[in-house]
UniProtKB/Swiss-Prot annotation:
One Pfam family per UniProt: YpsA
Family that this chain belongs to: Belongs to the UPF0398 family.
Database matches in InterPro entries: YspA (IPR010697)
Entry-linked Gene3D superfamilies: 3.40.50.450
Name by which UniProt lists this protein: UPF0398 protein Ldb1014
Length: 186
C-alpha cells in the first residue's frame, strides 16, 4: 500500500481570492499531474492530507476527482478535535463536506486545541503513516509549511525509504504554461 502526505501553502499565503482564482486552478493541475503519474505507475493507494484552507483542501478535491477513475482513497487528518471551529460558516461547511466525502477522517488528538504539541504529534503521525510526501512549497518563500518541510528533511537524514517531492514556484510556473497549452488544444 502506497500512501502520500500532501501539504503546502495556505490560501492566504498565496494571495488566492475565492474558489475560482486562477492560481488555485494551476495548483490543482500540478497536484493532479503528480498524483496521476503515481497512480499510472501503481505507486499510490491513499492520499492523506490535512484540512487547512489552501493546498491541503485543494489536494483533497483533486483526490476526490481522481477517485472517479482510479482506485484511490482519501484520508483527512486533523491535528485536534475542534479544528476549523473558528472559521467562517462557509469554510466550516467546506470542511464538513470534505470529511463527509473522504474515505476516512479523524483527529490525531481527541482534545480541543491546547498548543503546539498537537501540531508536532500530527506531523509525527503523518510521517509515520505515509511513504512519501508532496509539498507545494518553495523553501525560498517560507510559509507555515516550513515546519513540515523542516521536519521531513530532518527525518530523511535517518530514513532512506521515504521520499519528499516539492512543487516549488518554478514548477508552478511550468504547470501554468502546460495548463494554458492544454486549454488551447481543446
Amino acid at each position: 500500500m502506497q500512501r502520500i502526505w500532501i501539504s503546502g501553502y495556505r490560501g492566504y499565503e498565496l494571495g488566492t481570492f475565492g474558489d475560482k482564482d486562477p492560481k488555485i486552478t494551476v495548483i490543482k493541475y500540478a497536484i493532479k499531474q503528480c498524483l496521476t503519474n503515481l497512480l499510472e505507475e501503481g505507486q499510490l493507494d491513499w492520499v492523506i492530507t490535512g484540512a487547512n484552507l489552501g493546498v491541503e483542501q485543494w489536494s483533497a478535491e483533486v483526490a476526490l476527482e481522481l477517485r472517479q477513475d482510479y482506485n484511490l482513497r482519501l484520508a483527512v487528518m486533523l491535528p485536534y478535535l475542534d479544528f476549523g471551529s473558528r472559521w467562517s460558516e462557509n469554510n466550516q461547511l467546506k470542511l464538513q463536506n470534505l470529511k463527509n466525502q473522504a474515505d476516512f477522517w479523524s483527529a490525531t488528538s481527541k482534545e480541543p486545541y491546547q498548543g503546539g504539541r498537537q501540531f508536532r504529534e500530527y506531523q509525527q503521525f503523518m510521517f509515520q503513516h505515509t511513504d512519501r510526501a508532496l509539498l507545494v512549497y518553495d523553501p525560498e518563500y517560507p510559509g507555515k509549511s516550513k515546519y513540515d518541510y523542516e521536519m521531513i528533511e530532518k527525518y530523511l537524514e535517518k530514513r532512506d525509504d521515504y521520499q519528499l517531492d516539492l512543487v516549488d514556484y518554478y514548477d508552478l510556473e511550468q504547470a501554468a504554461r502546460d495548463y494554458e497549452e492544454n486549454q488551447r488544444e481543446w
